[in-house]
């Protein structure tokens, strides 16, 4: 059972975070990816001061093209607008996984710049590590005037539900001038002006090996950087706290760690990839032992963006959803007692051949964590992550919170027993062989740390 001293230590961490006062009327939830796309395009079209788009990638497909064209249109109509886009340096200069690197997103950014002379929409490539596998720009948020449109989504056809398929995420718009300024200033000083950051919309950009030393130093500088602001809200009022971090000792990681044990009744977690760091698993077990309820909503393996249907050619990356399911099955087998008593509720999300990308936490009715953080070892150690922690002590967001969770649960089934999940023996032959080979050389543990 969590001792009072330990719980107070966790609550003390949250109490000491600087909090910005927030009006309930200035928080808007969107519940579907198409609504998010329309809201983003409307915000861009009506912006009067600044547009700062930060995402893992802005893809050269219909969805991505619609966003970049809207940015060029806004800048052309209002030249005084400060417009900038920031994406991951490495991701922008390769094709999709398994595709050739010809005609990359960076090549497209260059063409758009050439086709729109005199209309400057800079696209910056942020290198979080010397290789994409060892760290990416996973910072999220679209800062438009005094609003932050926050989602874990990147910008392409499926995230924006441009056509038939969608990738489900969370979407909030928070109007808060102080928070928008804090985030914008941090992006300006640490990303736009960062060592090793270069424009991708210029053909004269350097090659990655040429800036390797800059990237290494830059990564250390990112580790040491954080938001600096003073809070202006009491602990009994609705407030928001922006968080940013890189590396396992970041303030963001510490806050996630301390947030979980503060649940008095119930903790709800969403993650698309079930691969929780060990210390978060320990938090969950301690909550269960002290009589609290824990709900975990994850994607079914077929709703994973890396899933390859059995009738398509198999690629190694297609083993990932199975590795995540193995993790979940092992976790449930340890905690089957709490599943039987309905204290531990695990839901699998599946909606036809759409995919699931939700992440975040809800602690009782008091705390909500909006984040792009997948709550996995990769997010914990390698990627640049951020979040917005909402404190709602008077439960003013209760209706929106319940609607969001109701819609998330809509396409889920509850796992009643760990044997409801397939075992390795049930997997397709190629997947089974690969996983057994990985286990034999113990590389599956290494993979779990970087994915």
Q: Predicted regions span which residues?
A:
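HKD-type phospholipase D/PLD-like phosphodiesterase module
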Residues: 10, 15-46, 61-263, 302-361, ...
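Residues at the starts of beta-strands that form the adenosine-phosphate
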Residues: 50, 82-84, 266, 289-295
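Generic beta-strand/beta-sheet core signal
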Residues: 54, 86, 144, 151, ...
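Short, glycine-rich nucleotide/cofactor-binding loops
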Residues: 57-62, 270-278
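Short, surface-exposed basic-aromatic patches at helix termini and helix-loop junctions that form
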Residues: 69-76, 282-290
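Short, solvent-exposed amphipathic alpha-helical segments in soluble enzyme
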Residues: 188-189, 283-286, 405
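Short, catalytically relevant binding-site loops at active-site mouths
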Residues: 274-276, 301-304, 376
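Long, C-terminal catalytic modules of enzymes
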Residues: 338-451
């Amino acid at each position: 059972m969590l001792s009072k001293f330990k719980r107070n230590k966790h609550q003390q961490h949250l109490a000491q975070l600087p909090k910005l006062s927030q009006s309930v009327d200035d928080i808007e939830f969107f519940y579907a990816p198409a609504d998010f796309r329309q809201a983003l395009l409307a915000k861009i079209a009506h912006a009067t001061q600044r547009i700062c788009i930060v995402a893992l990638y802005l893809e050269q497909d219909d969805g991505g093209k619609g966003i970049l064209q809207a940015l060029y249109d806004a800048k052309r109509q209002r030249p005084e607008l400060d417009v900038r886009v920031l994406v991951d340096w490495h991701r922008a200069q390769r094709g999709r996984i398994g595709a050739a690197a010809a005609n990359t997103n960076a090549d497209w950014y260059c063409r758009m710049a050439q086709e729109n002379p005199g209309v400057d929409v800079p696209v910056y490539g942020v290198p979080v590590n010397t290789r994409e596998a060892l760290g990416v720009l996973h910072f999220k948020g679209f800062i438009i005037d005094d609003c932050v449109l926050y989602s874990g989504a990147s910008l392409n056809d499926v995230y924006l539900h441009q056509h038939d398929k969608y990738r489900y995420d969370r979407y909030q718009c928070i109007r808060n001038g102080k928070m928008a300024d804090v985030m914008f200033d941090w992006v300006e000083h640490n990303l736009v002006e960062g060592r090793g950051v270069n424009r991708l919309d210029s053909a004269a950009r350097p090659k990655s090996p040429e800036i390797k030393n800059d990237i290494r130093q830059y990564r250390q500088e990112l580790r040491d950087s954080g938001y600096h602001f003073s809070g202006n809200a009491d602990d009994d009022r609705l407030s928001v706290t922006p968080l940013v971090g890189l590396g396992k000792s970041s303030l963001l990681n510490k806050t996630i760690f301390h947030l979980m044990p503060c649940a008095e009744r119930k903790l709800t977690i969403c993650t698309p990839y079930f691969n929780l760091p060990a210390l978060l698993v320990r938090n969950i077990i301690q909550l269960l032992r002290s009589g609290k309820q824990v709900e975990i909503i994850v994607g079914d393996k077929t709703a994973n963006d890396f899933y390859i249907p059995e009738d398509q050619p198999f690629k190694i990356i297609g083993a990932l959803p199975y590795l995540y399911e193995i993790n979940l099955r092992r976790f449930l087998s340890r905690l089957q007692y709490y599943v039987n008593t309905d204290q531990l509720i695990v839901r699998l999300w599946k909606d036809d051949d759409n995919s699931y990308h939700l992440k975040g936490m809800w602690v009782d009715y008091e705390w909500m964590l909006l984040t792009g953080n997948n709550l996995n070892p990769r997010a914990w150690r390698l990627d640049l992550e951020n979040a917005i922690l909402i404190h709602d002590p008077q439960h003013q967001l209760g209706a929106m919170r319940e609607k969001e969770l109701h819609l998330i649960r809509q396409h889920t089934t509850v796992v009643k027993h760990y044997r409801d999940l397939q075992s390795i023996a049930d997997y397709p032959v190629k997947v089974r062989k690969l996983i057994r080979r990985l286990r034999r050389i113990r590389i599956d543990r290494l993979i779990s740390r970087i994915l």
